[in-house]
């Protein structure tokens, strides 16, 4: 796996979280497997490669890859506008988070508690989702920039959906942090668009 592929996997994680946030906001639903993959990515320690963070299978990120391709192709028919907005907002929030050692410490201190809950209850148990959502609220929600989620108020006002959305945003920002640590930069999305697309097309064709 080359460096660009590693970056695209992490960026695919950002877009996967964005797609799931949009899906829950609009329909109130997202599969447990998809949510579990993203929550699990928060708890992975010392992965052998970037794909292992997301369960070791590109299929776990297929919706994120599609949304990323749509953004890079700039084709109005395939562009997913809200997921793109959420993804770019997560990249921006991660840059703010990187300057806040106190918030990074809080996240680092509380993730082991969430891991213990996941070990006891299971990864997609409501307690684990609620704790992950609360961690987002106590840290990233305190930053100046906020992510405004648009959707159906019937679903957005349900506490369980609000927790899922916050937990997914936390996972997306974790993926954004990983992307940046792997050498990812926002200017790549503008100036290296064709190169990223060609690599993504290959990744989506080739089984992991």
UniProtKB/Swiss-Prot annotation:
UniProt keyword Cell membrane, yes or no: yes
Membrane topology label: Peripheral membrane protein
Keywords, ordered alphabetically: Cell inner membrane, Cell membrane, Cytoplasm, Membrane
Disulfide-linked positions: none
Main location: cytoplasm
Top-level division of the source organism's lineage: Bacteria
Record GO cellular component, one term: plasma membrane
Annotated compartments: Cytoplasm; Cell inner membrane
InterPro entries: HflD (IPR007451), HflD-like_sf (IPR035932)
Pfam families associated with the record: DUF489 (PF04356)
Protein family: Belongs to the HflD family.
HAMAP family referenced in this protein's UniProt entry, alphabetically: HflD_protein (MF_00695)
Name the record gives this protein: High frequency lysogenization protein HflD homolog
Natural source organism: Pseudomonas putida (strain W619)
Top-level taxonomy: Bacteria, Pseudomonadati, Pseudomonadota, Gammaproteobacteria, Pseudomonadales
Record gene name: hflD
